[in-house]
Amino acid sequence: MLYGIDISSNQGKIDFNRVKNAGVEFIIIRTTTKNQNPDVRLGEYVKGCCEFEIPFAFYKYMYALSPDGARTEAKAVVSTLNTIGVLPSKSIVVYADVEDKTQFALSTPALTLVVQAFKEEILSSGYSFGLYMSKSPYETKEVDYTLFNDKIWLARYPFTTARGLKDVPNDTYKPKAKNGELVGWQHSSKGIVSGINGYVDLDVFYGDMTIGEVSPSYYATPEFTLIECLNKIGVYPSMETRKRIAIANNIPNYTGTKEQNLLMLALLKDGKLKTA
């Protein structure tokens, strides 16, 4: 059993070093907002997970009321992940978060078609799919769970008081997957974890989670210095090394100026930086 959290920009600035030391073993991160824009801290959170080798997955809180709307939401998620360098991989799971009241106003067949459309788009883009719901609407078949033989992540909060990361309720409260595999249980929305200000959702997952990877181009963002980028792609960033790289990339008289470093970062982002 792994102890983890799920987060969005509501958690604000996170100290990932403290989070890691607190025992967090995985993090599930919100991808996009209602208007399909990236969560404003998505890149920052992915960076933190990568730096401290915390396995991660993603979720999309769904609002779509039609299959076409679901495909639009899924495409926005895929585009966002590609933009930050989280390239398609079956080790990267995107969970459809189905809990909005407007969706539950749909009939079960209609909402099932919505979720199926989202799933198909995620899978066809090369990622893995999972379904997140609260226990009650899942069991009452707001979505026809018999059609989702997938990773199932269910929410059930037995207690309303603040909880520590490893204060997991006993298994008598654990929800059950009616179909597919119960991979995770969100057991509290009032978690207290070092490194996070305020409450955070607490989860336990069963089995292993892969440490996610991002492409080298992700590191060529304003959040990273050239030295950090070179370290991330396994190149020792001494001044002599950077001078050699500059020569190889036709950047003359390298002295480490901002302009020269930005040129290298641009080449790295485009996958054109020669490092030898």
Model-based region annotation:
Residues 1-119, 123-126:
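Substrate-binding cleft of extracellular glycoside hydrolase catalytic domains
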Residues 1-9, 147-214:
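Functionally critical loop-and-helix segments that line ligand-binding/catalytic clefts
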Residues 88-171:
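Catalytic domains of cell-wall/extracellular-matrix polysaccharide-remodeling enzymes
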Residues 207-220, 272-276:
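Low-complexity, Pro/Thr/Ser/Gly/Ala-rich linker/spacer regions in secreted
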Residues 215-236:
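Extracytoplasmic/periplasm-facing segments of secreted or lipoprotein envelope proteins
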Residues 241-273:
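Short, Lys/Arg-enriched alpha-helical microdomains
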